[in-house]
């Protein structure tokens, strides 16, 4: 089956910047995250595709190989094998040293794994240690990873222990994985009952992950050696923990700054005064100046997120929303009417500068049609 284009999966162009790639991933990951779509297999598949595309395109080296060679340049499961990039592709078509092919087949690094971890904005603000449980392939204890009950192996008769066989097509010679032993270089006559001759079994592993303060959506934390077990003494793969931050009821995050809307009363907007504003690390008192209008933004410095790339902390920007009183009593309505009368006929010019400007603009606009 033909694999989908990573750029199409993220709905971005091939010239997209790193910021655009991250933004596209964040948007789609939030939409298709399994926790938000329980039991939805299509969403789960879509989320895996999105994560795979982001893993490749967010890495400059992998993206470069993908742009040059397509999926074959980055897919460990392709016919090019491993992580050798262009050299492995070249060797596959034009042949390589026999010893190099043997070494690659005999010792195989474990696969990298990926785990998606959803945390709160508060946890991203303060940092947190999380415990996760992952399924991974580990060396079989019953056969010590040999795949054999007797822990003995027989040299493969087809490749003579090399793990690869050499074929000739016209003028070209190329190597391919031995189909008899699947590249191991040996055969097993008494397969282990626990791992069925694979030398590995799937186990559940519980790990603790330290999340640094300031982590953002789409960030990945690498746990070296916590992926699948390697074969024949090779290194284990790595575990990459991708961070998804839940939406917050009050705050919206943009880079290291936080944003919120702050409702204030009609009287507070007119007269000014102190109000308590919630932040992620406690309440602060904000002084509202008299005659504050809806839309005014107050900046609380260093009340945002910490930068992972330095000691700088972002700001919290609070946008004022003046609330109109509701459920007024007859007495309150009467008082407001008296208040309105007290403003006089020149209300707009003296007491509502924005309204005056708006009406003046409307009049100027209308004149164009009646002059």
From Swiss-Prot:
GO molecular function: ATP binding; heat shock protein binding; unfolded protein binding; zinc ion binding
Keyword presence, Cell inner membrane: no
Domain J residues, every copy: 5-70
Cofactor: Zn(2+)
Binding, Zn(2+) 2: 156, 159, 178, 181
Pfam families the UniProt entry points to: DnaJ, DnaJ_C, DnaJ_CXXCXGXG
GO cellular component: cytoplasm
N-terminal signal peptide: none
InterPro entries reported for this sequence: DnaJ (IPR012724), DnaJ_C (IPR002939), DnaJ_domain (IPR001623), DnaJ_domain_CS (IPR018253), HSP40/DnaJ_pept-bd (IPR008971), HSP_DnaJ_Cys-rich_dom (IPR001305), HSP_DnaJ_Cys-rich_dom_sf (IPR036410), J_dom_sf (IPR036869)
Cofactor comment: Binds 2 Zn(2+) ions per monomer.
Record key words, sorted: Chaperone, Cytoplasm, DNA replication, Metal-binding, Repeat, Stress response, Zinc, Zinc-finger
CXXCXGXG motif repeat locations: 140-147, 156-163, 178-185, 192-199
Zn finger residue spans: CR-type: 127-204
Principal localisation: cytoplasm
Gene Ontology terms: biological process: chaperone cofactor-dependent protein refolding; DNA replication; protein refolding; response to heat
Subcellular location per the Swiss-Prot or TrEMBL entry: Cytoplasm
Binding residues for Zn(2+) 1: 140, 143, 192, 195
Subunit relationships: Homodimer.
Domain note: The J domain is necessary and sufficient to stimulate DnaK ATPase activity. Zinc center 1 plays an important role in the autonomous, DnaK-independent chaperone activity of DnaJ. Zinc center 2 is essential for interaction with DnaK and for DnaJ activity.
PANTHER family: CHAPERONE PROTEIN DNAJ, DNAJ HOMOLOG 1, MITOCHONDRIAL-RELATED
Family, per entry: Belongs to the DnaJ family.
Cited function: Participates actively in the response to hyperosmotic and heat shock by preventing the aggregation of stress-denatured proteins and by disaggregating proteins, also in an autonomous, DnaK-independent fashion. Unfolded proteins bind initially to DnaJ; upon interaction with the DnaJ-bound protein, DnaK hydrolyzes its bound ATP, resulting in the formation of a stable complex. GrpE releases ADP from DnaK; ATP binding to DnaK triggers the release of the substrate protein, thus completing the reaction cycle.
Name this polypeptide is given: Chaperone protein DnaJ
Organism field: Francisella tularensis subsp. holarctica (strain LVS)
């Amino acid at each position: 089956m033909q694999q989908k284009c990573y750029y199409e999966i993220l709905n971005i162009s091939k010239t997209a910047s790193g910021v655009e790639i991250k933004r596209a991933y964040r948007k789609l990951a939030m939409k298709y995250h399994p926790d938000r779509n329980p039991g939805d297999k299509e969403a789960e598949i879509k989320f895996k595709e999105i994560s795979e595309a982001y893993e490749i395109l967010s890495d400059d080296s992998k993206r470069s190989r993908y742009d040059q060679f397509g999926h074959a340049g980055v897919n460990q499961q392709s016919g090019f094998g491993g992580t050798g990039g262009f050299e492995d592709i070249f060797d596959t078509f034009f042949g390589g040293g026999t010893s190099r092919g043997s070494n690659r087949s005999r010792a195989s690094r474990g696969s990298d794994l990926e785990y998606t971890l959803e945390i709160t904005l508060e946890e991203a603000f303060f940092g947190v240690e999380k415990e996760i449980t992952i399924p991974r392939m580990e060396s079989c204890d019953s056969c010590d990873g040999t795949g054999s009950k007797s822990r003995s192996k027989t040299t493969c008769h087809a490749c003579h222990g090399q793990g690869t066989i050499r074929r000739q097509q016209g003028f070209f010679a190329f190597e391919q994985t031995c189909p008899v032993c699947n590249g191991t270089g040996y055969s097993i006559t008494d397969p282990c009952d626990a791992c069925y001759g694979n030398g590995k079994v799937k186990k559940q592993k519980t790990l603790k992950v330290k999340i640094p303060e300031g982590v953002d959506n789409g960030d990945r934390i690498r746990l070296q050696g916590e992926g699948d077990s390697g074969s024949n003494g090779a290194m284990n793969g790595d575990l990459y923990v991708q961070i998804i931050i839940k939406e917050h009821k009050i705050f919206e995050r943009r880079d290291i700054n936080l944003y919120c809307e702050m409702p204030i009363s009609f009287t507070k907007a007119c007269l000014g005064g102190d109000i308590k504003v919630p932040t992620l690390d406690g309440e602060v008192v904000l002084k509202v100046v008299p005659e504050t209008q809806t839309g005014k933004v107050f900046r609380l410095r260093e009340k945002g997120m910490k930068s992972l790339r330095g000691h700088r902390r972002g700001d919290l920007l609070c946008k004022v929303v003046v609330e109109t009183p509701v459920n007024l009593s007859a007495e309150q309505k009467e008082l407001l009417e008296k208040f309105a009368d007290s403003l006089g006929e020149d209300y707009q010019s003296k007491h509502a500068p924005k309204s005056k400007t708006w009406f003046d603009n409307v009049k100027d606009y209308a004149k164009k049609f009646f002059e």
